[in-house]
Structures are given as C-alpha cells and as structure tokens.
Regions:
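Predominantly flavin-linked oxidoreductase catalytic cores and closely associated redox partners
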Residues: 85-229
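Generic enzyme active-site microenvironment
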Residues: 3-4, 127, 259, 265
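Glycine-rich FAD pyrophosphate-binding loop
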Residues: 1-14
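C-terminal helical "tail/cap" subdomain of flavin- and related membrane-associated enzymes
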Residues: 286-406
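Helix-loop-beta segment of a Rossmann-like dinucleotide-binding subdomain
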Residues: 54-73, 110, 198-202
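N-terminal FAD cofactor-binding segment of flavoenzymes
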Residues: 11-52
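FAD/FMN-dependent oxidoreductases across multiple families
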Residues: 38, 203-287, 293, 299-304
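Short beta-strand to alpha-helix junction loop
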Residues: 62-84, 205-210
Length: 406
C-alpha cells in the first residue's frame, strides 16, 4: 500500500473529538493505548438546559453501548500515531507529494504526482481517495454537489484558560446554541480548549476585518460561553472554513473508491467526521480486498458498501438538519427515556448508527415524537424551517483551509 500525502506531519487539522464507536476500531488497529496517552477522557456530551444547568448525555447510557467513553485528541498528535502505526505495518508513506491528475480509463488507474524531485507516476491495483475535504476525485470527476438542504461555515481556534466542566465532566464536549448557529468547546491536554462557532453563511457574510474579533463577538452571543471564556488567551490562529455540506453523486467506480470526507461531509455537529472516516476506511479496505480477490464481484461489493455508509450518514443528517430548530432545542433540553428513546439518541451521539437495529427502531420513534412536537409549535417550527432553507442557498467565501473549493 502506497500513501501519497501532499503535506508533512505534524500539521493542523480539524476533527479533535472522537466518538465511543471509534474505540473498537482503535482497539483492532492496536493503537488504543497510544491514543489514550495523548487524549482527554470524554464520557459524554453536554447540552445546556432551560434551568441554567446542563443535560449531560453520558455514553454509558447508550442503548447497547459498545464503549462507554471516547477521547478528545490534539489532531496533529492523533494523526502522528496513526501515520507511524501504518508505517510500522509496512505501508509506503510518502509526504510532500501532491497528486496532480488521475486517469481511470485504463486497465489500472494512472496517478501523476509531483514532489521536490519532479513528476512521478503510479499505477495502483486500486485507487482510494482519502483526500478529505479537498475531495480530489469528486472535483476531478465533477461528482461533488453542494447539499441542497444544509450549509454552514465556522470560525475556530485554540485557547488556554477556558473554564472546564467540573469533575468527571471536565473532558466532555459542550455544545451551545446561539442566534446564528451553534458553538463547541472541546477540552484538550495542557489546559488547551478548542473553541469554535458554526454559523449560518448569511451571518458569516457580516464578518469584517479581524477574524479573532469576529469570533469573540460571536462567542459573546451566548452568556454561558462568554463566562467560560473570561480571561482566556488565544494560542493558535483563527481559522475559517465554509460550505461544509456536500456529497458526491457516487462513491466508487472500476478500481477506485472515495472514503470519509472525500465522499461526503455534512457538519461537525456531533463530532461524527473522524468516526465516519475511520468506519468507512475499515469497511472500504475489506471491500477492496474482496474485490481484488474476485473482480467480478466488485460492482456488487461497491453498491453494498455505499448503501451501508449512506444509511449511517443519513441518520446523522436527520439530526443535523434539525438541531438548531426550536423543536429539537426543547427535546434536548427536556429529554425523556420513553421506550428507551433517550438511550437511542445517546447511542447516535456515540456513533452507533449503522448496524444496531434496536437503536435504529427507536430513532424512528424519536422522529415521530419530533413531528408531533413540531406540530404543537407549528408557527415557530415553520419559521425555523424557512430560515434553514434560505441558509442552504447561501455560500460562504473566505475559507482559510481549503481555498473555497466547492
């Protein structure tokens, strides 16, 4: 296996909050203890409630919990652990080499890439696009489409001196809402806090001048976040990224496959990105191995993989599309475990959205509860739906990470 990486490790990357469903994958890879050593223990997710406190959804409460914890990780350190492990397992890892073109019409893919010594060619038996939000094949093959139902943009950075939640909740991710979207606080080692605000593109267009000032003004929109940020010091650049939501019209073709964000991304809400990438990579690797052993089965295997991954992605999408709605706000602020529905929602927050039929059945019950609650507050729900539809048509330009590729 040869991996072509255009950058060099360590490097900055978003995606610092793992899910409990990452833990079995890390265990199978043999790196769980290494990740434990660099991470902060995460036992749940905190959402403010109407009484001024928090509703903490603890992963131990998840229906059929496969892991009761996860970790918050400095992403550069996490990637370094995985990169070193892959090299130790025999992978040919090349850094500082940028893929410039691919040809997929021959018996084997042809990849042309450039490093410091010039142009190089590769003819892999199978081509896997794991380029993340750069979406190399999606752009090359013109398969990438903006999500017509959801768009958002974000500003984020790292700070020291941000107040943490007390006791065993100190490592939890905290999710707050504001008038134009939502915010995250992710505790990292060494008193570092990853802080970000995900916003409607319409609101992001009001940004003028200094990005740090705009981020701080946005964070001040939520009094609880402002209180936790008192006395905090920024220790990293403020980054902006936008046009989050996209999906490619297909995931695969003869001898090629897209994985993770290279195929689709919706929103950083619920911290699903790293888990979806790793789950798709594990399933994708098994699919490629089977297809190379039996080429006649490739198309069938690819269809099965795409159905499987779309199913889980669609579960996250349903919640993400509605999270900032007044209906979802009330349901999360006043959770009730009728028919184990709350436990199923916690399982979703843990990433268990693919194969657990008990969870999936109860999430359908939650959808029915949501629909009835929305009818009970129909004018507010209707206004929120119209606002979301308007934002889905907006585009944000000013990405500091991906050059506004969309």
């Amino acid at each position: 296996m040869t991996l072509l990486e255009k950058g060099h490790h360590p490097r900055f990357h978003i995606g610092e909050s793992l899910l409990p469903m990452n833990m079995p994958i890390l265990q199978r890879l043999g790196v769980l203890e290494q990740v434990r050593a660099i991470g902060v223990l995460k036992l749940g997710a905190d959402f403010p409630n109407d009484s001024g406190g928090y509703n903490t959804f603890r992963f131990a409460q998840a229906l059929g919990a496969q892991s009761e914890y996860a970790f918050q990780v400095p992403r550069a350190d996490f990637d370094r652990v995985l990169f070193a492990h892959a090299r130790g397992a025999g992978a040919d890892l090349r850094e500082g080499i940028k893929v410039e073109s691919v040809q997929l019409d021959g018996a084997q893919p042809l990849v042309q890439a450039r490093d410091a010594d010039g142009l190089r060619q590769f003819r892999p038996r199978y081509l896997i696009d794991a380029s993340g939000r750069d979406t190399f094949l999606g752009n090359t093959l013109k398969l990438k489409r903006a999500n017509p139902r959801h768009q958002s943009a974000a500003l984020f950075s790292h700070f020291r001196g941000v107040a943490r939640r007390p006791g065993e909740d100190a490592g939890n991710i905290s999710i707050y809402r504001h008038a134009h979207g939502w915010m995250w606080l992710i505790p990292l080692p060494d008193d570092v806090m990853s802080v970000g605000a995900v916003c409607d593109p319409e609101y992001m267009k009001t940004r003028q001048g200094d990005s740090e000032a705009f981020l701080l003004r946005t964070l001040a929109l939520n009094p609880d976040v402002a209180a936790r940020m008192q006395g905090a010091q920024r220790i990293a650049p403020v980054h902006a990224t936008g046009n989050y939501a996209y999906e490619c019209t297909r995931m695969s073709g003869p001898r090629w496959l897209m994985l993770g964000d290279a195929y689709a991304f919706v929103d950083p809400m619920f911290s699903s990105g790293v888990y979806l990438a790793m789950h798709s990579a594990e399933r994708g690797a098994a699919m490629v191995d089977a297809a190379l052993r039996d080429p006649a089965s490739e198309a069938r295997l690819q269809r099965g993989l795409e159905r499987h991954l779309r199913r889980g992605l669609n579960e996250f999408k349903w919640f993400i599309y509605r999270f900032t709605s007044p209906t979802m706000r009330e349901l999360f602020a006043q959770p009730r475990n009728v028919l184990q529905v709350e436990q199923a929602v916690v399982a979703m927050l843990a990433g268990d959205v693919f194969d657990n039929r008990a969870v999936l059945r109860r999430l359908r019950v939650f959808r029915a509860i949501y629909a009835m609650s929305a009818l009970a507050m129909l004018p507010r729900a209707w206004r929120a739906w119209r606002h979301r539809r308007r934002q889905a048509r907006e585009q944000f330009h000013g990405d500091t990470l991906h050059g506004d590729k969309s």
